Amino acid sequence: MLDTLLPFKRHFLSRNGNKLHYINEGQGEPVVMVHGNPSWSFYYRNLVSALKDTHQCIVPDHIGCGLSDKPDDSGYDYTLKNRIDDLEALLDSLNVKENITLVVHDWGGMIGMGYAARYPERIKRLVILNTGAFHLPDTKPLPLALWICRNTLLGTVLVRGFNAFSSIASYVGVKRQPMSKYIREAYVAPFNSWANRISTLRFVQDIPLKPGDRNYQLVSDIAASLPKFAKVPTLICWGLQDFVFDKHFLVKWREHMPHAQVHEFADCGHYILEDASDEVITHIKHFMTETETLATQVNPADSITEFESASQAPQAER
């Protein structure tokens, strides 16, 4: 069934003794899609299918996720920096170093924008889907469920013993209608044992909340880099019923990316590419076509002015 739902060739990159799985479909300018937690490259399957005839679609599974290896702590240090290093190594191995359309979701925002902060000149467009690339907004407390997973033995038992994080997310992450049995099973399938759920837990434990926490300075540095991208053509599609990446995060993105095209989906949750797949993919394809047309018609120095005019046109809000 998985081969039917994810009909792409498997590719693997060796990373310090671990195999990192990635999708690499199509030819043309690269579209790099970075997933979060507790999902995997499966999240982007429909977008890959929609774009692979015209673009090179690259979708890694982070170590510990999807079809990548899932080593214990002795075999991999589950940190944000290592995630960014892995993404850089993958793109370097594919010689992908320019004209990147970067698509990010959940933790993928921090990882993807961490890469972008290192190489801002490589980024052509940004597509932002229910994610963050900055510290928890002052107006947003850490949800209790994440606090329990991050800080307690009970959280460890629930996440690694009962797959609570991945399983529950497959239910509450969509709002329009439930995932089908087969789609839900595909989301949770890689996390099928205590050992194979290590990444799901380590991601939550890696959330920095205060100075001195691991990754706190790195997140600060990534956030500080965002002004470099204020004039990069940006599309934001946002499910407003996400209990983690909610309107507080969207407000921060609007501040950082004042020229972005923004589409809000009032009846959608965290997994917006499941809740509103056809609509979001249509927005992405239109955005890419529109910005490509502008890039070929106007002086690059003036392209943001043209893009601003387009992005400020009336938007249909759902």
From Swiss-Prot:
Q: What Pfam families does the database record attribute to this sequence?
A: Abhydrolase_1 (PF00561)
- Which reaction does this chain catalyze? a cis-3-alkyl-4-alkyloxetan-2-one = a cis-alkene + CO2
Keywords from UniProt, A to Z, are:
Lyase
Gene3D superfamilies in the record, alphabetically?
alpha/beta hydrolase
Ranges for domain AB hydrolase-1 = 30-275
The lineage's top-level taxon is Bacteria
What phenotype has been reported when the gene encoding this protein is knocked out?
Deletion of the entire oleABCD gene cluster leads to the complete absence of nonpolar extractable products. The oleABCD deletion strain shows a significantly longer lag phase than the wild-type strain when shifted to a lower temperature.
InterPro entries assigned: AB_hydrolase_1, AB_hydrolase_fold, AB_hydrolase_sf, Epox_hydrolase-like
Gene Ontology MF terms: lyase activity
- EC number(s)? 4.1.1.114
Q: Name one GO cellular component term.
A: membrane
- EC primary class: lyase
Cite the SUPFAM superfamilies for this sequence. Answer: alpha/beta-Hydrolases (SSF53474)
Q: Does the keyword Ribosomal protein apply?
A: no
Purpose: Involved in olefin biosynthesis. Catalyzes the elimination of carbon dioxide from beta-lactones to form the final olefin product. The S.oneidensis oleABCD genes produce 3,6,9,12,15,19,22,25,28-hentriacontanonaene, which may aid the cells in adapting to a sudden drop in temperature.
PANTHER family this protein is in? CIS-3-ALKYL-4-ALKYLOXETAN-2-ONE DECARBOXYLASE, MONOACYLGLYCEROL LIPASE
Q: Family, per the entry?
A: Belongs to the AB hydrolase superfamily.
The name on file for this protein is Cis-3-alkyl-4-alkyloxetan-2-one decarboxylase
